[in-house]
Amino acid sequence: MTRFFLVRHGETEWNRLRKIQGVSDIPLNDTGRAQAAALGDILSKHSFDLIVSSPLSRAQETARIVAAKLGMPAPLAIHDLIERNYGEAEGSSGAELDTRYPAGVEIPGREDRADVAKRVVRTLHDLAIRHPDADIVVVAHGAVIRSVVEYAAPGEYSEPITNCSVHSFSHVAGELALVAFDDPMEVLSHELADEEFVDQNPAEARESSRG
């Protein structure tokens, strides 16, 4: 059995401002770095075999901070762990999204959710084949993790995926199963933020509300 611990990156300024990031390469802010360090302290109580991440800088920096806390080598960047592409909606706030693309209007260039799930699940499957019986930390993004949760446990979890939260999965005989949404080992990262946590991505929140 291979176990995966999917981690969302730490906070960025666009997260704080509730702007849609997608594949826009927005770095961590100071809160995000503190979240990553706190998560690293918690994960250091456990043993892991490998850390991989999305190629975007917010995920890579989170993964590097965690790897340093664990005394592990620099994480491997895997392109197919990149965040969902939100096309022309990237950089928009919720109000701007509603004005430019009201509910029901297609957002030009937005990646289909099913395509996100396909590439991410394929990546996890490939990692499980190459690293059987390993415990692997995967630092990625909210929509990436959401796609895997929906693949493994469709319709069961609608709660926001917080910065530096951990969601654990098992991979046995080619089957991916959700072990824990918000794994108990995680840091409650919203306690490090200045305001009550709500879903930071208005496009994802709107789509999730429709099922």
What residues fall within each predicted segment?
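Loop-to-helix element that buttresses phosphate recognition and phosphoryl-transfer chemistry
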Residues: 5-61, 109-121
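Acidic, low-complexity terminal tails and accessory targeting/binding regions
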Residues: 72, 84-95, 150-211
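Glycine-rich phosphate-binding loop signature in dinucleotide/nucleotide-binding domains
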Residues: 45-47, 127-134
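Short active-site segment of divalent metal-dependent hydrolases/proteases
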Residues: 12, 144-145
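Active-site signature of alpha/beta-hydrolase-fold catalytic machinery across serine-
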Residues: 65, 147, 151
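Phosphate-coordination/substrate-recognition cap region in phosphate-metabolizing enzymes
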Residues: 37-100
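Generic beta-sheet signal
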Residues: 4, 134-140
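Short glycine/proline- and acidic residue-enriched helix-loop micro-motifs
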Residues: 97-115, 200-210
